[in-house]
Curated annotation (Swiss-Prot):
Family: Belongs to the cycloisomerase 2 family.
Organism whose genome encodes this protein: Staphylococcus aureus (strain NCTC 8325 / PS 47)
Pfam families per the UniProt record, alphabetical: Lactonase
Protein name: Uncharacterized protein SAOUHSC_02143
Lineage: Bacteria, Bacillati, Bacillota, Bacilli, Bacillales
GO molecular function ontology, one term from the record: 6-phosphogluconolactonase activity
Cystine residue pairs: none
Cellular component GO terms, alphabetical: cytosol
């Protein structure tokens, strides 16, 4: 049995963090329950037996740390709610486990926290930095919108996507906070959202929410150079849709991207050691608004959460040879589910 967690909005029926048990032998979820009620826990990241989730209480915003016990159940360690500038949308941990990074979409800011490397508790907010970059012309690009922050494969920087400014910004970081390093621009109105790095550290898959495209970019010392781009929806689709999550299979052979509105998952074959993509197919996600999904470590199953509609959690069997996915379970619900991790 594999334990997984789903983060959620708590605007309507969402409860916070859901815990589920994935039965990989039967290709289904045997149990899905409220793991811990945590307001606005829209993104999660795990460090072994510690789980971090975005959180807010009233006007105070930040991150909570929770201990994962031997049964996969969650117990609160502590909270660091040191800001009133807005709730985050993405969190990640530095390789040395000393820092936690947070991106805040609404306010266009990034945060950096100090962690206790022994207990996993959050010690303090080190810095909150506002983006001030020229924005695109799309109606949703009225100001900067930091959407993702994570350490680069070389370990030297953090890369931050800005959906409002159509770019990736890299920063040096230390105990004092962030220091601007470089920026990489994409097309106007792309709405740069997330990054998935190939294991070789040379190539990155940059997804753009507003243009519904994925860029293959060469990464070198804090800079991203676009090599090619691909639509993640059919060319003739004219409905309202926006790209969401991106994940590589663990064997690095296939890339998956979800589309909210078209309600699908696009599957690409990874070629030439990561520098090219080729569309395999686009498969229905089995629900409404597939905000996030993840792939079990075995590479056999893909689990997808849906923010809207019935908020069904779909499980797909994955063909490792073709990359294609087949729906095999849609019996569980995680209201307002927007993040899936194992």
């Amino acid at each position: 049995m594999t334990n997984g967690y789903i983060g959620s909005y708590t605007k309507k029926n969402g409860k916070g963090i859901y815990r589920f048990e994935l039965n990989e032998n039967q290709s289904r979820i045997d149990l899905l329950e409220t793991g811990f009620e945590l307001e606005a826990s829209t993104y999660l990241v795990r460090n072994n037996e510690v789980l971090y989730g975005i959180n807010k209480e009233g006007e105070q915003c930040g991150v909570a740390s929770l201990k994962i016990d031997d049964n996969g159940e969650l117990h609160l360690l502590n909270k660091c709610l040191s800001s009133k500038a807005g709730t985050g949308c993405y969190v990640s941990i530095s390789e040395d486990k000393r820092y936690l990074f947070e991106a805040v979409y609404g306010a266009g800011i990034i945060r950096m926290y100090e962690l206790n490397t022994h207990t996993g508790e959050i010690i303090r907010l080190i810095q909150e930095l506002a983006h001030d970059f020229p924005t695109g012309t799309h109606e949703r690009q009225d100001h900067p919108h930091a959407h993702y922050i994570n350490q680069t494969p070389d370990g030297k920087y953090v890369a931050v996507t800005d959906l409002g400014a159509d770019r990736i910004v890299t920063y040096k970081f230390d105990d004092n906070g962030f220091e601007f390093y470089k920026e990489s621009l994409f097309k106007d109105s792309d709405g740069t959202r997330h990054i998935e790095f190939h294991d070789n550290g040379k190539f990155a898959y940059v997804v753009h929410e507003l243009s519904n495209t994925v860029s293959v970019a060469e990464y070198n010392d804090g800079k991203f150079e676009e090599l090619e781009r691909h639509l993640t929806i059919p060319e003739n689709f004219d409905g309202d849709t926006k790209l969401a999550a991106v994940r590589l299979s663990h064997d690095q052979q296939f890339l998956y991207v979800s589309n909210r509105g078209h309600d699908s998952i696009a599957i690409f074959k990874v070629l030439d050691n990561g520098q090219h993509l080729e569309l395999v197919t686009i498969t229905e996600s089995g629900g409404q608004f597939p905000r996030d999904f993840n792939i079990a470590s075995s590479d056999d199953l893909l689990v997808c959460a849906h923010e809207q509609g019935d908020s069904v959690v779909t499980v797909f069997e994955r063909n490792k040879e073709t990359g294609k996915i087949t729906l095999c379970d849609n019996t569980r619900v995680a209201s307002e589910g927007v993040c899936v991790i194992f």
